[in-house]
Amino acid sequence: MGHKINPTGLRLGITQEHRSRWYAPARTYPTLLQEDERIRKFVNKKYASAGISSVLIARKADQLEVELKTARPGVLVGRQGSGIEELRAGIQKTLGDKSRQVRINVVEVERVDADAFLLAEYIAQQLEKRVAFRRVIRMAVQRAQRAGVLGLKIQVGGRLNGAEIARTEWTREGRVPLHTLRADIDYATKVASTTYGVLGIKVWVFKGEVLPGQKQQPPVGAAPRRRASRRPQEFEDRSNEE
């Protein structure tokens, strides 16, 4: 019987990059890996309203670099960069080391509706507001199509609309070639907590095919957003540099 592998893990080093970029000896590897997990849990819990798509962590000597890809960078940066200082202090407290050098970069997601995690988060928020799941899926598909994705698959499982028996419903628009390694597949999962229990959400987004060493370009037919004239924002923290 066939089993579905995680599309992100299958394509690491081909079209996907590692979420943690560092090397460590065997004796310290478990400790650093647990630190990464604590950092991600802290960021996703404290800044749940910031629309954080991914948290990338890199380590260089004694410096820790955290890159946050978000749909709303203003929520993280704050007024005059006050949010960056608060975030750094929170990470240092989470790690139990206030002297740890932490460098934070905030990057704005260019196409919010083409990001699998942000789409899954949108679906979860609507389901928690008791919106009918078929309507939510239809709206999510329309948003993704306006963003110019080449293919999209959405799966929702659980007690849909409060049904007594749990079931799984899914829909697919366009191409989603999961067997093609050069296919740029963005995959995300999310859990929606409702009065009838939890609903599991899975989203696959096909953005095109890319060869190793090439950078994925947005499709030609991608519909621009209302704020398309703005350049993607990137806020780089250099406060720890001398």
From Swiss-Prot:
Location of region: Disordered: 214-242
Organism domain of life: Bacteria
GO CC field: cytosolic small ribosomal subunit
Comp. bias (Basic and acidic residues): 231-242
Coiled-coil region list: none
Domain KH type-2: 39-110
Keyword Ribosomal protein found: yes
InterPro entries cross-referenced by the UniProt entry: KH_dom, KH_dom-like_a/b, KH_dom_type_2, KH_sf_prok-type, Ribosomal_S3_C_sf, Ribosomal_uS3_bac-typ, Ribosomal_uS3_C, Ribosomal_uS3_CS
Entry's Gene Ontology BP terms: translation
GO molecular function, one term: mRNA binding
UniProt cross-references to Gene3D superfamilies, sorted A to Z: 3.30.300.20, Ribosomal protein S3, C-terminal domain
Keyword vocabulary terms for this entry: Ribonucleoprotein, Ribosomal protein, RNA-binding, rRNA-binding
SUPFAM superfamilies registered for this protein in UniProt: Prokaryotic type KH domain (KH-domain type II) (SSF54814), Ribosomal protein S3 C-terminal domain (SSF54821)
The family this protein is said to belong to: Belongs to the universal ribosomal protein uS3 family.
Quaternary structure and partners: Part of the 30S ribosomal subunit. Forms a tight complex with proteins S10 and S14.
Function: Binds the lower part of the 30S subunit head. Binds mRNA in the 70S ribosome, positioning it for translation.
Protein name: Small ribosomal subunit protein uS3
Species per Swiss-Prot/TrEMBL record: Synechococcus sp. (strain RCC307)
Gene: rpsC
